[in-house]
Amino acid sequence: MQEKDVSSHGFLPRFQHFATQAIHAGQEPEQWASKAVVPPISLSTTFKQEAPGQHSGFEYSRSGNPTXNCLEKAVAVLDGAKYSLAFASGLAATVTITHLLKAGXQIISMDDVYGGTNRYFRQVAAEFGLKISFVDCSKSKLLEAAITPETKLVWIETPTNPILKMIDIEACAQIVHKHGDIILVVDNTFMSAYFQRPLALGADICMYSATKYMNGHSDVVMGLVSLNSETLHSRLRFLQNSLGAVPSPIDCYLCNRGLKTLQVRMEKHFENGMAVAQFLESHPLVEKVIYPGLPSHPQHELAKRQCTGCPGMISFYIKGSLHHAETFLKSLKLFTLAESLGGYESLAELPAIMTHSSVPKSDREVLGIRDTLIRLSVGLEDKQDLMDDLDQALKAAHPTNASHN
């Protein structure tokens, strides 16, 4: 169920009861002898058994932890899923998912993906006998043409990182599931559970780098996976226990706490992101702005059909050269020059040199990851302060053209 929101800019209505579920799901005080309202941090690595092989739900913290269990139950509800698993990082989740495959199987990955995902597929997974194909999955015909009898997994991000292409999840699911037992994975990191529910659109697995919006405070490294298949869940749980890709109880506690403000944070990210995107689009020192919330985005209508809003992720091309981009980034005062995204603080980075430097230069050029492409993670500060900071940094990068206003 979804509820109407007059400030949604034409996007889908917000998911009903989201804030209530984020605060209460999996947090029931009755599960603790102390009736604690806030789930405690369970640091114990092992748990007493009543008799050999008879435990009360937990035996060893790698295979299950009470604090992680609270987080997983909450995330499952927010994703509209039956199951959720917390991992030590987003890449730990990615590695575990690919272990569902055997050597010789093919992974089709969206060509524009997080640099770490690209690096893992290209330089690690391929070395273990997996066939990797990078395809523009925003074009259904290209995805269809890339599928072979060896295809076992399709991996997409929407919006993509850093070019912010939107992919029609439902269309991808229809194509993928025509071909038998292929798993469709959607990296939902940029949108978070608040703005997009991939499982409801046909994805088999929804995954996150929870380091970003889901936690939202830049103090946790974690991955999350949500799904509805009991078979896939059992297999992933086994693989996670076997590979050891588990998060610490403290990180689970922090991420669980971060979920409680996910709704209010994402609404503010949307408000600030839209304001900054509109400001940049009208700025004479900016060549082009990429933001799915803007009508100028080539897949704006798809974004409105598929999502309930947009996060604070904006990419734009500054006019000039690498020198101008670097000067701009070094001149920022409120935006911090740093990798990562999705925290309450605003960040800026240069993908070609930072997050996507491991992507081959020839591929970067084809994708549009040029030396003048800047990625912003717009935080929760006062939006006018953010726009003022961007304006002064743009003028610093182009001092001879700074007299435009």
From Swiss-Prot:
Record InterPro entries: Cys/Met-Metab_PyrdxlP-dep_enz, Cys_met_metab_PP, PyrdxlP-dep_Trfase, PyrdxlP-dep_Trfase_major, PyrdxlP-dep_Trfase_small
Transmembrane segments: none
Biochemical pathway: Amino-acid biosynthesis; L-cysteine biosynthesis; L-cysteine from L-homocysteine and L-serine: step 2/2
Ligand binding (substrate): 62, 114, 119, 339
Gene Ontology MF terms: calmodulin binding; cystathionine gamma-lyase activity; homocysteine desulfhydrase activity; L-cysteine desulfhydrase activity; L-cystine L-cysteine-lyase (deaminating); pyridoxal phosphate binding; selenocystathionine gamma-lyase activity
Biological process annotations from GO: cysteine biosynthetic process; cysteine biosynthetic process via cystathionine; hydrogen sulfide biosynthetic process; lipid metabolic process; negative regulation of apoptotic process; positive regulation of canonical NF-kappaB signal transduction; positive regulation of NF-kappaB transcription factor activity; protein sulfhydration
Record-stated family: Belongs to the trans-sulfuration enzymes family.
Protein name: Cystathionine gamma-lyase
